[in-house]
Amino acid sequence: MSVRKSLRCFSILLAAVCTLPLCTGCSIPFLEQEESDGSGYLFTASLAANPKSLDPQSATDAASKTIIENLYEGLVELDENGSPQLAAAENYTVSPDGLTYTFTLKSDRFWFYDANADDVVDDDEKWQVTADDYVYAFQRIFDPQTQSCLQNADAVQSGQLAPEEIGVRAVSSTVLQFSLSRPDAEFFSNLASTAAMPCSETFFQQTKGRYGLDKDSVASCGAFYLRLWFYDHYGNQNQIFMRRNSVNAEARRVYPTNLT
């Protein structure tokens, strides 16, 4: 393997990332339904603060991460017991020396951006999630222009190491490989962090610096997509409205049609 730059700084950072439940103090009447596909229901939840950014690679506040976890899906997720399990990845292997992690992506994961806001999936509004999306996400984490708060990323941010030299590469469109400088028992679970979620480079560039800052600059690859983001700095009627993302295979699971 030619790429063997340090990913341990990423692992250290992500170990400190925590997640929040979707809802605090809200009622869930539809859970009384014994048989339902979840459609037609609206799940309402309250956040302690307004999300500052829905960019997985730069969001640091708890409110933002709560929304991000519903809009995006990474390689790994935490189950109800806090244990890591595969999400967008079909399987993975670890080399005998513990330095190489290879993930095979599921083929039924897609990005969706409702460009005309009609809640209909047009052919040009969805595209495949690929290994390159994860590579670009990790490059953004370490890119000096991102002004990341990552610990131990000084070498990259100072320009001594180019973001492209980070130890992650796309072997193919569906195979992603990480190279570590030393074994890290926490690396797999740290991939459940929001920062490790994919980023579509083409869409990112189209947002012209607005990525994750408003409804029109968010493309979803998770269970829901962003339908409305009303944000008033001086008011208390702020609202985020998400709809179930039908292009994602997770739509087969039981959950409500809408979140607000």
What residue spans do the PLM features occupy?
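Gly/Pro-rich hinge or "lid" segments in bacterial periplasmic/extracellular proteins
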Residues: 173, 184-258
